[in-house]
Amino acid sequence: MLSVIILAAGKGTRMRSSLPKTLHTICGEPMLFYILETAFSISDDVHLILHHQQERIKEAVLERFKGVIFHTQIVEKYSGTGGAIMQKDKTPISTKHERVLILNADMPLITKDALAPLLESKNNAIGLLHLADPKGYGRVVLENHQVKKIVEEKDANDEEKEIKSVNAGVYGFERDFLEKYLPKLHDQNAQKEYYLTDLIALGINENETIDAIFLKEECFLGVNSQTERAKAEEIMLERLRKNAMDLGVVMQLPNSIYLEKGVSFKGECVLEQGVRLIGNCLIENAHIKAYSVIEESQIVNSSVGPFAHARPKSVICNSHVGNFVETKNAKLQGTKAGHLSYLGDCEIGKNTNVGAGVITCNYDGKKKHQTIIGENVFIGSDSQLVAPINIGSNVLIGSGTTITKDIPSGSLSLSRAPQTNIENGYFKFFKKP
């Protein structure tokens, strides 16, 4: 086994946001959560180094994860990546295991499989990337698959600038290596910071073996700006789409479809172009038509859309919800709502037809109220159901009716004023001959 240390103390200035960088989301999840999940998949001893807005980050983490060991970086005294793992006396923070893996919190695309080459190394090791264009990165000079030295770009000569090997920002160390060299680190550099790369340099100077482990570039993309966040999200989306299609989900124009990590699929499902699946959703034997939005809802044996919106806590089973229908906290069982309706805070029974323009009036300006509709109900177009209200089974509601009282089963309900036709009324109103 090994211990994992995740570095998350930075300010994330380039994100230009009051939200801590590591809490910015990738496909609906804070990017820190991805790296924590990966860490717990390989270790029972996970450490998180915090400083900037640490209480906010800690609160978010504790809502989801148990067993994280929190540390506060002493940035006033020991800043930088090397300082992040230092205690007050410059010794490394205590870990359960002798092998220590160090990761950055702003790399949400890292997976267990991507880390495998680094985990297999028995020596102290640094993860490397091979970049076609390494401009802006420090170069790693190799000799017989071992790290010879690390050169910052500004200090590299012309030959070294041609090197494509760069530091991925992940490390595997033995604890005795950290205990030996971490106290020797200094901050005599332009930034006045302690660097993990300098730790490696100290080891190389004393003939320590440092393995160079090449990793997949795509999995170790660092997120330091909104542009990089968007790029990481697109890569994550490609993974989620592929996983869904591998399960048999049909996607029309998949690049136009957005889905989040909490979405699960069962049975035969079709997603048309422009569909958005947000939060924890279950899509089972369902056809989600073009440009529909499903949030925190369950769609089972049903068709939804096009241009429909299932807001949180909608459970739509054996039903058809058509274009421009919005549901919220609604339970539909065997229901047809073809067009232009709002169905909020309601339960609707089997074989019920909801006409165009029907609205459940669920909010009285102070609180929400529920509408209960039985089975075999026909609701005429442009009707308003003013909650709280209970409509029995086998009920017919005439078009344009406003319902304010409960309707017993077997009833016909009408509330329209009688129609009046005034002879020559058009000409009188417009004063035309």
UniProtKB/Swiss-Prot annotation:
Return the GO cellular component terms, semicolon-separated.
cytoplasm; membrane
Q: Which reaction does it catalyse?
A: alpha-D-glucosamine 1-phosphate + acetyl-CoA = N-acetyl-alpha-D-glucosamine 1-phosphate + CoA + H(+); N-acetyl-alpha-D-glucosamine 1-phosphate + UTP + H(+) = UDP-N-acetyl-alpha-D-glucosamine + diphosphate
Q: Which residues bind UDP-N-acetyl-alpha-D-glucosamine?
A: 7-10, 21, 80-81, 138, 152, 167, 224, 311, 328, 342, 353
The positions annotated for binding acetyl-CoA are 356, 362-363, 381, 399, 416
How does the cofactor attach, per the note?
Answer: Binds 1 Mg(2+) ion per subunit.
Cofactor(s) the protein needs: Mg(2+)
Segments of this protein annotated with the region Linker? 227-247
In this protein, the active site sits at: 339
One matching Pfam family is NTP_transf_3
Enzyme Commission number, as recorded: 2.7.7.23, 2.3.1.157
Q: Which UniProt keywords apply?
A: Acyltransferase, Cell shape, Cell wall biogenesis/degradation, Cytoplasm, Magnesium, Metal-binding, Multifunctional enzyme, Nucleotidyltransferase, Peptidoglycan synthesis, Repeat, Transferase
Where mainly found? cytoplasm
- Describe the protein's quaternary organization and the partners it interacts with: Homotrimer.
The family this protein is said to belong to: In the N-terminal section; belongs to the N-acetylglucosamine-1-phosphate uridyltransferase family. In the C-terminal section; belongs to the transferase hexapeptide repeat family.
Described purpose of this protein according to its UniProt entry: Catalyzes the last two sequential reactions in the de novo biosynthetic pathway for UDP-N-acetylglucosamine (UDP-GlcNAc). The C-terminal domain catalyzes the transfer of acetyl group from acetyl coenzyme A to glucosamine-1-phosphate (GlcN-1-P) to produce N-acetylglucosamine-1-phosphate (GlcNAc-1-P), which is converted into UDP-GlcNAc by the transfer of uridine 5-monophosphate (from uridine 5-triphosphate), a reaction catalyzed by the N-terminal domain.
Family annotation (HAMAP family) = GlmU
Please report the name of this protein according to its UniProt entry: Bifunctional protein GlmU
Organism expressing this protein natively? Helicobacter pylori (strain ATCC 700392 / 26695) (Campylobacter pylori)
Lineage, highest ranks first: Bacteria, Pseudomonadati, Campylobacterota, Epsilonproteobacteria, Campylobacterales
